[in-house]
From Swiss-Prot:
Keyword Magnesium: no
Protein name, per record: Leucine-rich repeat protein soc-2 homolog
GO biological-process terms attached to the record: cyclic-GMP-AMP transmembrane import across plasma membrane; positive regulation of Ras protein signal transduction
Listed transmembrane segments: none
Pfam families membership: LRR_1, LRR_14, LRR_8
SMART domains linked to this entry: LRR_BAC, LRR_SD22, LRR_TYP
Record lineage: Eukaryota, Metazoa, Ecdysozoa, Arthropoda, Hexapoda
Superkingdom, natural source: Eukaryota
């Protein structure tokens, strides 16, 4: 049987009628099945023929498909009983009750049926046009397709076929007739397998099977040796067969988000790979053969269960990105220092205590280093040279108790440092040399003092010092004129310096959970401030100048047990959207007004303000 023949395997043909129904013409006998009987030839040679004769003799009455009475074209309608009365028992048509097995299930709405029919018609028309016009690119994505018509075999000119985001559970065998196909997108369907006929698509370069229901890599894929790009992300694949080695032309392979426990030695045969993504699987080890993939520039291994990395990884001298986040590594091999093209090194979420001596210094192209959520107790060895070209360092959530003096002396491009959740008690004496720093996160440490030299960090835009042991902020903070976010939450601060008012670019000031008794009047100069949190302090009053904060949108002053009244000037904050005054003994404002939200409180303040005539 030639599945790719336009005439098909039988003599019947299908066409779309003007009413939207598919009309079938067949050279064989036909049988019409009705709800109340069987009419026409093709049945047994007994009663059916005689019944037809009897019906013809009875004014040629016919049985309609809707279950109504037989119709006499030349006279009145006859009931079934009347028909039976004029017919011998042996020639009477048998009563047939047709009941679908799922007839008890809720029936789809007419609207849904019409929509599906229309979708099917659109697909058929698209395939016909593709055949008639020799179209090379066909996009049937998001078309609610459940079954791809076998007439797809006629679209032999196709080089690109997009079927993503449908409801296809199985491809027709005729897909193999598309011998010119180069790009086939089947992502976001319900495929559990692929037909063997796909092997005839010998020119296929790109195959996208993301987000399907494949429990294994279909064996036919291994026969598509022209493939350069294969996406198998988010399926249910548990293993990779040794036949993978046949796909020697692959440059991109994605097996992300499956259930793969082992990557066999066959991976080493894919010497043309430039991108390999096996993240979010269950790998515990990598084969040594990974070192044969010398053209790899991106290797993503994050979110696995890797216990070690083979030394052969040092052979990947073209590697630019290596993702090792969230595994079970205790160390990395020193051979990584040979991967001198790497610009990002990320081992977040492992159990690493130290890196090999001088490894980072050897990776001179690094711009981003992420060592967060490990077991480091000190900075990596290698001195200032290891951060020469780095602009971002993340050591969050480790056990580091100090930043070595001069460690960033060569890091002229360092703009972002995250030391959150460590054990720092002080900053190094040369902190004033970090002049290019833009974002500095020192939250959740044990800092007791902020050095005056902080004034030199004049490019700083984000300074996070929350959850430390600071008692005061130096006056030199006013020199940080570019500061947009200042987070001092959960310290022991009692007084803010007057110079805080010089931070005209400040948008968020977080002072929650301190021991502040009053805000400086200069706070009114913070014209760009949108968020001010002073909750859980010891405020006795708010300065009148708070009314000058024309950009203020959120104000948290809750849980200040000594705050008994609000200044009338607060009503001047026209952009205020959220006001939290819970657990403040505001005796002057009625409870029902307080419960009404910020707009009602502001309205009350305005009505009772001496400025109400203004």
């Amino acid at each position: 049987m030639n599945l790719c023949s336009s005439a098909g395997a039988t003599a019947s043909t299908s066409s779309l009628s003007s009413s939207g129904h598919v009309e079938s013409n067949s050279s064989g006998p036909s049988e019409a099945i009705h709800c109340f009987g069987v009419v026409g030839g093709g049945g047994n040679s007994g009663g059916s023929g005689r019944a037809d004769t009897a019906l013809n003799q009875s004014n040629r009455s016919t049985v309609n498909g809707g279950g109504g009475n037989p119709t006499n074209s030349n006279g009145p309608n006859l009931t079934h009983n009347e028909i039976n009365a004029i017919m011998p028992p042996e020639t009477r048509p048998k009563m047939v009750t047709v009941k679908h097995p799922e007839s008890n299930k809720p029936k789809p709405t007419t609207k849904k049926i019409v929509k599906n029919i229309q979708a099917d018609q659109d697909v058929i028309k698209a395939l016909q046009r593709c055949r008639d016009e020799g179209i090379k690119r066909l996009d049937l994505s998001k078309s609610s397709i459940t079954v791809l018509p076998n007439t797809v075999r006629e679209c032999v000119h196709l080089t690109e076929l997009y079927l993503y985001s449908n409801k296809i559970g199985q491809l027709p065998t005729e897909i193999g007739c598309l011998v010119n196909l180069r790009n086939l997108a089947l992502n976001e369907n319900s495929l559990t397998s692929l037909p063997e006929s796909l092997k005839h698509c010998t020119q296929l370069k790109v195959l996208d099977l993301r987000h399907n229901k494949l429990a294994e890599i279909p064996s036919v894929i291994y026969r598509l040796r022209s493939l350069t790009t294969l996406y198998l992300r988010f399926n249910r694949i548990t293993a990779v067969a040794d036949d993978l080695r046949q796909l020697v032309n692959l440059t991109m392979l994605s097996l992300r988000e499956n259930k793969i426990k082992e990557l066999g030695s066959a991976i080493g045969a894919l010497v043309n790979l430039t991108t390999l993504d096996v993240s979010h699987n269950h790998l515990e080890h990598l084969p040594d053969d990974i070192g044969n993939c010398v053209n790899l520039s991106a290797l993503d291994l994050q979110h696995n269960e890797l216990l070690d990395i083979p030394d052969s990884i040092g052979n990947l001298k073209s590697l630019v990105r290596l993702g090792l986040r969230y595994n079970r590594l205790n160390s990395v091999p020193i051979s990584l220092k040979n991967c001198k093209s790497m610009d990002e090194f990320n081992v977040e979420g492992n159990g690493i205590t130290q890196l090999p001596d001088g490894m980072l210094a050897s990776l001179s192209a690094l711009t981003t280093i992420t060592l967060s959520r490990n077991q480091f107790t000190s900075y990596p060895t290698g001195g200032p040279a290891q951060f020469t070209n780095v602009y971002s360092i993340n050591l969050e959530h480790n056990r580091i108790d100090k930043i070595p003096y001069g460690i960033f002396s060569r890091a002229k491009g360092l703009t972002k440092l995250n030391m959150k959740e460590n054990m720092l008690t002080a900053l190094p004496l040369d902190v004033g040399t970090w002049v290019n720093m833009v974002e500095l996160n020192l939250a959740t440490n044990a800092l007791q003092k902020l050095p005056d030299d902080i004034m030199n960090l004049q490019n700083l835009e984000i300074l996070i010092l929350s959850n430390n042991m600071l008692k005061k902020i130096p006056n030199t903070i006013g020199n940080l004129r570019k500061l947009r976010i200042l987070d001092l939450e959960e310290n022991r601060i009692e007084v803010l310096p007057h110079e805080i008012g010089l931070l005209h670019e400040l948008q968020r000031l977080i002072l929650q959970t301190n021991q502040i008794t009053m805000l400086p009047r200069s706070i009114g100069h913070l014209s760009n401030l949108t968020h001010l949190s002073v909750s859980e302090n010891n405020l006795q009053f708010l300065p009148e100048e708070i009314g000058s904060l024309e950009s203020l949108e959120n104000l948290y002053i809750n849980q200040n047990p000594g705050l008994e009244k609000l200044p009338f000037e607060l009503a001047l904050c026209q952009n205020l959207k959220y006001l939290n005054i819970d657990k403040c003994p505001l005796g002057t404002i009625p409870p029902e007004i307080q419960a009404g939200g910020p707009s009602l409180v502001l309205q009350w303040l305005k009505m009772h303000s001496p400025y109400r005539q203004m």
